[in-house]
């Protein structure tokens, strides 16, 4: 069992939590993490880039000058790719960059990412963070107390006060546990999980492992 310290939002240690080794103590395979991150970033691409070929550039129907006798090079159209304002050859066209990664592979990669954070002592467990109102100053104090520079805060469920309080803090991102992904985990220096969120992630990622 992975024994992890549990803190309150005042940065005081209040106990420990045992986390399942099949989720938080998995051997890390960098090539698998790389594959899943590539898939995530590829899925974000719009793929709307487009250039005009000779079929779509306006004009250029008339031969600019006769074939022989002018002393100039032969030209059949002012929209040739050789000309300024002409068409583009083999340029980018709209396309879909997404590629499939199996669900079990994505889940394994997430377990690896969380395991890496635990090994590097960058996984923080909090009992809870609760604010009576939306106040950036309250969240800024928590961040300052823990000395977080770039942190991913994982909640068991949506918390409007906390999410809005953290929205303007640079380097701080708040997500629900069901939206946790490999790219966000690796991108941030610290992964801060509420205890209930960690247990839900453990249940979800540990289900069906043999």
From Swiss-Prot:
Protein's name according to its UniProt entry: Large ribosomal subunit protein uL4
Disulfide feature: none
Gene3D superfamilies xref list: 3.40.1370.10
Entry-linked InterPro entries: Ribosomal_uL4, Ribosomal_uL4-like, Ribosomal_uL4_dom_sf
Cellular component annotations (GO), alphabetically ordered: ribonucleoprotein complex; ribosome
Superkingdom in the source lineage: Bacteria
Family: Belongs to the universal ribosomal protein uL4 family.
Keywords: Ribonucleoprotein, Ribosomal protein, RNA-binding, rRNA-binding
Taxonomic placement: Bacteria, Pseudomonadati, Thermodesulfobacteriota, Desulfovibrionia, Desulfovibrionales
Pfam families associated with the record: Ribosomal_L4
One GO biological process term: translation
Protein role: One of the primary rRNA binding proteins, this protein initially binds near the 5'-end of the 23S rRNA. It is important during the early stages of 50S assembly. It makes multiple contacts with different domains of the 23S rRNA in the assembled 50S subunit and ribosome.
Span list, region Disordered: 56-80
Species of the source: Solidesulfovibrio magneticus (strain ATCC 700980 / DSM 13731 / RS-1)
Complex formation: Part of the 50S ribosomal subunit.
GO molecular function, a single term: rRNA binding
